[in-house]
Swiss-Prot record:
Mn(2+) 2 binds at residues 12, 63, 432-433. The active site is at 63 (phosphoserine intermediate). It is an enzyme of class 5 (isomerase). One of its GO terms (cellular component) is cytosol. The gene is gpmI. Belongs to the BPG-independent phosphoglycerate mutase family. This is 2,3-bisphosphoglycerate-independent phosphoglycerate mutase. The lineage of its organism: Bacteria, Pseudomonadati, Pseudomonadota, Alphaproteobacteria, Rickettsiales. Gene3D superfamilies: Alkaline Phosphatase, subunit A, BPG-independent phosphoglycerate mutase, domain B. InterPro entries: Alkaline_phosphatase_core_sf, BPG-indep_PGM_N, Metalloenzyme, PGAM_B_sf, Pgm_bpd_ind. HAMAP family: GpmI (MF_01038). Pathway: Carbohydrate degradation; glycolysis; pyruvate from D-glyceraldehyde 3-phosphate: step 3/5. It comes from Wolbachia pipientis wMel. It catalyses: (2R)-2-phosphoglycerate = (2R)-3-phosphoglycerate. Binds 2 manganese ions per subunit.
Length: 506
């Protein structure tokens, strides 16, 4: 095929929706470049959810999961599924035992903090209640710092989740101590004021006080404030973290816990840090945080990035802040350091309260740099992520989502033009999961802010090429076939190319 370079363009949250549905921001926007490539290049559809990406059946996919499946070239059993299978038998876990023994010896309180949600993207409330119950059985007082979702779930599902969670906490000495919307507790874009506001409620009980979590949520709903944006609050007579206490970070996904964990450990410029005795996380978060964890990470051999390195080729990863970790850490399946020959470019995301206020985000700045790198012809593989469809889709604002679609489409046209002008270069356009193609939940009569179960597109800018439907783990083998590189045995995905006659970039 004589392809020397592949540009893998991941349109984050761009799923295959119902055409001409009034809540499909893609079809509403009628993006011209998208219509062109969909009509003129080989295409197929990929499954991006459930068992096809290593999640429980019927579970929506997400960006972490999607990028790991794409980058590894295999179905990766995800943290949610793994913990579901193993959490019932974690009593013998060495790090958990050490954590419990430290609390017992000092008569400390266990502070469990995490997203109390059934969304399954960053955490699951059943994991948190199981941990609370197992720890309280040792005579340890447990307090919960509940983060509310409304982003990977319906915007006003928090009340129901908290009610169910409260019933599931069996320990007599277990209760909810603080409540915070994830907008504050789980920021990942260096909006430190948000993180500090959540931290001060958790560490020092410095926040408005309410009698119980349900009434707090109801009061916010009455003021049109949904789960994600509920300001940190103290519940009852909670007094804060004490030196003899322990902290357990219950989210299994790392990216939205790094800032809070960094403040807890005194690794930021924030001066007033509460002392505590021990800390533990559900999964490994980040090497330099040095937090013990319950479930060790899975190692991956012969990923796409590794294979490109092994063939002594160069690769580029480029994204704006919101998705930078996905094209680097997650795409490389948990490897923090770049591969040899891997260049990384971070484009700062705009500093706005929510991205419906600036739907184009930093897509144009990103594209300018990307086009420059495509023309350089330095790289065998370029991986780029456009965050707009997902980040604006999460706001539930359909008009803004349509603007986001058009902004990305404008960028896509520039990328396609650059690829056409570069010899022996192919463009792949795909997505990691759906979102922006469904902006309203008609059944519940509420904006749809979560991901979808829809398949995602896969388009290759090659003539005379036939594709078959597949799943995200088939993308890496397809890229290797285009580049004429043998697929490693560890890659269990299969190329999506079903037939080649005379393929050339176009």
């Amino acid at each position: 095929m004589n392809i020397k370079s592949v540009v893998l363009c991941i349109l984050d949250g761009w799923g295959n929706g119902i055409e001409n549905n009034k809540y499909n921001a893609i079809s509403n926007a009628n993006p011209p470049c998208w219509q062109y490539i969909s009509s003129n290049y080989p295409k197929c559809s990929l499954s991006a959810c459930g068992a096809d990406v290593g999640l429980p059946g019927g579970q929506i996919g997400n960006s972490e999961v999607g990028h790991m499946n794409i980058g590894s070239g295999r179905v990766v059993i995800q943290s949610l599924q793994r913990i579901n299978q193993e959490i019932g038998t974690i009593e013998n876990n060495v790090n958990l035992q050490s954590f419990i023994n430290d609390l017992k010896s000092k008569n400390g309180v266990c502070h469990i903090m995490g997203l109390v949600s059934d969304g399954g993207v960053h955490s699951h409330q059943k994991h948190i209640s199981t941990l609370a119950n197992k720890i309280s059985q040792h005579g340890i007082k447990v307090v919960i710092h509940a983060f509310l979702d409304g982003r990977d779930t319906l915007p006003n599902s928090g009340k129901k989740c908290i009610q169910e969670f409260t019933k599931s906490i069996k320990g007599n000495d277990t209760r909810i101590a603080t409540v915070s919307g994830r907008y504050y507790a789980m920021d990942r874009d260096n909006r430190w004021k948000r993180t500090i506001e959540a931290y001060e409620a958790i560490a020092f009980a410095k926040a408005p006080c309410h009698d119980n979590a349900v009434s707090l949520i109801e009061n916010n709903y009455q003021n049109n404030i949904t789960d994600e944006f509920i300001r940190p609050a103290v519940i009852g007579d909670y007094q804060g973290i004490k030196p003899e206490d322990g902290v357990l970070l219950a989210n299994f996904r790392a990216d939205r816990m790094i800032q809070l964990a960094s403040i807890l450990l005194g690794k930021t410029d924030y001066a007033k840090v509460a002392k505590f005795s021990s800390i533990l996380s559900m999964m490994k978060y980040k090497e330099d945080l040095k937090i013990p964890y319950i479930f060790p990470p899975t190692s991956f051999a012969d990923t796409l990035g590794q294979t490109i390195e092994d063939n002594k080729l160069r690769q580029l990863r480029i994204a704006e802040t919101e998705k930078y970790a996905h094209v680097t850490f997650f795409f490389n399946c948990g490897k923090e350091e770049p591969f040899s020959g891997e260049e990384r470019i971070l484009i700062p995301s705009p500093k706005v309260q929510t991205y419906d206020l600036q739907p184009e985000m930093s897509a144009f700045e990103l594209t300018e740099k990307l086009v420059e790198k495509i023309h350089s012809q330095e790289f065998a593989l370029i991986v780029v992520n456009y965050a707009n469809p997902d980040m604006v889709g999460h706001t539930g604002n359909i008009k803004a989502a349509e603007k986001a679609v058009l902004a990305v489409d404008d960028c896509l046209a520039k990328v396609l033009n650059a690829v056409k002008k570069s010899s022996n270069t192919a463009l792949i356009v795909t997505a990691d999961h759906g979102n922006v193609e469904c902006m309203f939940d008609e059944e519940n009569n509420t904006p749809h802010t979560a991901h979808t179960l829809n398949k995602v597109p896969f388009i290759v800018s090659c003539d005379n090429l036939k594709l078959r439907d597949g799943r995200l783990s088939d993308i890496a083998p397809t890229i290797l076939q285009l580049l004429g590189i043998k697929k490693p045995n560890e890659m269990t995905g299969s190329s999506l190319i079903s037939c080649i006659t005379l393929c050339h970039s176009s």
